[in-house]
């Protein structure tokens, strides 16, 4: 079985945002490298393991992996629209499945989220046996911990889950947020996604982490069921459409956490959700936003 590998040369000022948006839209993996690699203009850049680098090359190349049947042209055009940029020039080549496994695994090293929380790929040893380690197989769903929106949500959960909460992860992807909530002390956790592959990846990752959560498609979520915490790390457009539904699943006094929102979309989404929630100030990370708030009675 083959996959589609796409190479996109991009200005480094927009490379990360564009790669992030492609992941949100269903890319299997992304990597950013020096567009001048192997030439006299190559720029070595190094960072600490588990920590994001604070700069990129002057000109970057985004390497993106898509499923064989993905509509690459449509996805790249959609990502360009979300990122507010023209559709870039790109090349596409087929790679065999064994190359995809190697390329994907080589991207994911352990990631430190906080002083006590790490994301560790299943093929790595845990870097800190005394920390809360989330063993993750990204599978075919977004949510590896390296994306700023995932990181923002994990940091909120780490700071706010006290123990015993019920949590709904709406748009669960790989299940990373639901699994983190359980390991941080939540006792009743549900994950919902529209993609059956994401649901299966979430279930597999829960087994890998030796935790129990209920993962399913949206029609498995009971109407009117309410939770102490709802986290939704999805794109701005679905968040616009789902406001009333998401609010209905948060109890009075409960908390909502939203991400997948570009910085310039934050005010609009915060104002929209203020119809149901007392909204906190937004938190930003690499051009992305986390919104949170408390459900009014």
Swiss-Prot record:
Residues the entry annotates as binding S-adenosyl-L-methionine: 150, 171, 193, 233
GO molecular function, one term: protein-lysine N-methyltransferase activity
Catalytic activity: L-lysyl-[protein] + 3 S-adenosyl-L-methionine = N(6),N(6),N(6)-trimethyl-L-lysyl-[protein] + 3 S-adenosyl-L-homocysteine + 3 H(+)
CDD domains, per the entry: AdoMet_MTases
Domain of life of the native organism: Bacteria
Localization per Swiss-Prot or TrEMBL: Cytoplasm
Keywords from the UniProt entry: Cytoplasm, Methyltransferase, S-adenosyl-L-methionine, Transferase
PANTHER family found in the cross-reference section: ELECTRON TRANSFER FLAVOPROTEIN BETA SUBUNIT LYSINE METHYLTRANSFERASE
Protein family per UniProt: Belongs to the methyltransferase superfamily. PrmA family.
Function: Methylates ribosomal protein L11.
Name of the protein this chain belongs to: Ribosomal protein L11 methyltransferase
Organism name: Laribacter hongkongensis (strain HLHK9)
